[in-house]
Amino acid sequence: MCFASSIIEAHRKLFIAPPDLDHSDPATPTISTRSKMPRGKSRLQTEVCGDCGAGDPSWASINRGILLCADCCSVHRSLGRHISIVKSLRQGNWEPSVLNFVNSLNAHGANSVWEHHLLDGSTNSTGGKHVPRWRKPTPKDALHPTKSDFIKAKHVNLTFVLKPSLQDDDDGNGSAGCLEQELSRQLHASVRTSNLETSLRFLVQGADPNYYHEDKLSTPLHMAAKFGQASQIEMLLIYGADVNALDGNGMTPLELARANNHNTIAERLLDAMYDVTDRIITFLGGKKPDHASGRHMIIPDANGADISEQLKIARGKLQLVPNKMFEELVMDLYDEVDRRECEAIWSTSTLNADHATVPFLPANPFLSATRNQGRQKLARFNRAEFTGLLTDVLVDAMRRQNMANLRPMDAPVAGHQSLQSLPYANNSMLLGSFEQGGHDPNLSDDEPIYDPVASDDDYAPVPPMAQQAIVHTPPRSANSHNEMETLRKQLNDYKSEINQLKNVVQMLSSENTQLKSKFSSASNNSVYDEPLRIDLSLSSPDTEHEPLSLPEGGTANGESGSSNDSSNQSTIKRPASMYERRLVPNVAKGNTDIRNTTSMYQMAGDGKPFGEEVKVRSDLVTRRLKELIRAMQPVPEDQKQSIAPHGELIRSAVTDLIALYANLPPNASDPSRETLKLLTRQNILIQHECENLQKAIEADDKQAIQKNTLEVRDCAFHIASAIKTLVLQFY
């Protein structure tokens, strides 16, 4: 903890002396004017509030570089961290380099940058003739509205800041981009010196803290690290400089500081990389990790804590958040941590009723309304819930950082980025304030964006946790390189394998499509679809050869038998096996008018009667079916036969049988045509099912064996039934 009296006294001799004229900015006459002030007056200005002149300031605005009294600080806090980053001089936890920077900037005239037009008397230069002249308030003036209006004009609207003019551009083309580039080049040169006021003026006017100088091949942060300017580094970090930026030699500012033996600056840059997690760990009651020894994270240990199902779901959702959204969440949590710390100090240090508290984060006009709502809802978490959320974020940040270390070729993930630049990322460019004129009129701090949330139970209270230090040891470069090469090689192999499999799938798909089209065309253009008329007789003197019941329009003698036929068809029962007799009433025995005429198409091609040839080929199919059934019977392992060849033999025999009907005349009967269609379809299916059964037997898949066996039996039954129908036409 640091105390204002000892702080100011310790730095008085260092920062009160008149600045060196060689480092003064010729464009800012206030510097030379202040350097000629008596020592007593200069000392007096450094010990007073920068906004109202009150003595014994107890707060400081880090990014403004001024000290503040409690009255003015209350207004600064209500503006938000995107305007002013305030911290208590007496009770705040300060980094020595940051405290040194604030006192140095305050002592060397930071207020002359924010009150430029107020000091030179041109307070009406930014408005019309009806704009009233501004007067700097005194300590005795009322906080509202005198002090608050002045502070908002000074720090929000930047009314008194010397704004850059496009006519001042050297190339005379009036380009805003060229003006910003010129300001950035001057900032790049200024950070090599100790003149903080000049650098602050360039930043306020719109210079880019991450500007990459094409000739010097470096950024301003590289230059400040190279020349050992610790205060300049703090200013650049506060205004958003990237601590991981690379120069033309591929070096970061940290590596450049070490190369120039600026070890203290190197340690500070290393701490800045982990400022977010350090701040959260400290807020949780932990000790700041020793980054120099490789310890970057201290996460509370939740051993023995009851984890609810809701908390598990919330943690799972947190891990699915994209890196960019995770960065924004960490930024908002960082701001909320700062608000709660300041609020705790504020509640114990002020007794004035006019000093309003800040119950939630003020609205930031540079953020969306949805995000502002989410930021303000963070204040609804109680201490236990907020602690649980911070702990989960720390764990997930470490997980994302480890993933980034395992995949260095990828872009930096949220954990990597948030540990480096998030504490300063929400300091918007002040040049945007010149163009927009301050806050969005639709957003007001008097009417905060605050609505009910869906649920407050995502993070249930977490019991007290012990602390466990996690040490990260940097991996060896050689091993990491070898591992990365191995992973790249494996990745390429997997990609080639996937491409090969895709080609195989595409080839099989095309072949399948071709086969389907061929089968469809063969079925549609088959000679069996031609109309033919076959005189069928359903009578059989032999009960062993009972015919199948086929639909017919009437009997041969012209008697109507539709009612009997329909009743007989409804009582047909499917046999349990292909050899079991059908239980069909013998309805055809009463028919005595049997046609015995043999037509010309009933002669086979070799001169044999057609019916005799059909019977011969049908017997062959029957033998093949019996062989298949025997092969499917359970036998010892050494006597098992392959099922697939039997399917091929059956297909060949059935094909020969169907070939006899190739020359049928177009007057064949419908039952014959349907029977041949059924026989053709089942002939194709039985070979396929036999192959599937063989594969199931080889894989010893009992469920598949049972299923495929039923399919094979079903196909064999239909083939036998169709053959029986064809044979009975001739008996």
Swiss-Prot record:
One family name in Pfam for this protein: GIT1_C
Major site of localization recorded for this protein: cytoplasm
Residues in coiled coil: 477-518
Biological process annotations from GO: brain development; mushroom body development; negative regulation of organ growth; positive regulation of hippo signaling; protein localization to presynapse; regulation of ARF protein signal transduction; regulation of G protein-coupled receptor signaling pathway; somatic muscle development
Effect of deleting the gene: Homozygous knockout flies show a semi-lethal phenotype and exhibit defective wing morphology at 100% penetrance. Mutant embryos show striking guidance phenotypes in ventral oblique muscle 5 (VO5) and ventral oblique muscle 6 (VO6), characterized by bypass and mistargeting of the mutant muscles toward the ventral midline. Defects in targeting of the growing ventral tips of mutant muscles toward the ventral midline are already detectable at late stage 14/early stage 15 embryos.
C4-type ZnF: 49-72
UniProt entry keywords in alphabetical sequence: ANK repeat, Cell junction, Cell projection, Coiled coil, Cytoplasm, Cytoskeleton, GTPase activation, Metal-binding, Repeat, Synapse, Zinc, Zinc-finger
Tissue specificity field: Expressed in embryonic muscle syncytia (at protein level).
Subcellular location: Cytoplasm; Synapse; Cell junction, Focal adhesion; Cell projection, Lamellipodium
Residues in ANK repeats: 216-245, 249-278
Presence of keyword Zinc-finger: yes
Taxonomic superkingdom: Eukaryota
Entry's Gene Ontology molecular function annotations: GTPase activator activity; molecular adaptor activity; small GTPase binding; zinc ion binding
Region spans: Disordered: 124-145, 435-461, 537-582
Compositional bias (Acidic residues): 443-459
Keyword check for Disulfide bond: no
Boundaries of every Arf-GAP domain copy: 32-168
A cellular component annotation (GO) from this entry: cell leading edge
SUPFAM superfamilies: Ankyrin repeat, ArfGap/RecO-like zinc finger
Stretches with biased composition (Low complexity): 557-570
Cited PANTHER family: ARF GTPASE-ACTIVATING PROTEIN GIT, G PROTEIN-COUPLED RECEPTOR KINASE INTERACTING ARFGAP
Function: GTPase-activating protein for ADP ribosylation factor family members, including ARF1. Multidomain scaffold protein that interacts with numerous proteins and therefore participates in many cellular functions, including receptor internalization, focal adhesion remodeling, and signaling by both G protein-coupled receptors and tyrosine kinase receptors. Through Pak activation, may positively regulate microtubule nucleation during interphase. May play a role in the regulation of cytokinesis.
Quaternary structure and interacting proteins, as annotated: May form homodimers (via coiled coil). Forms a complex with pix and Pak; the interaction with Pak may be indirect and mediated by pix/dPIX.
Protein name: ARF GTPase-activating protein Git
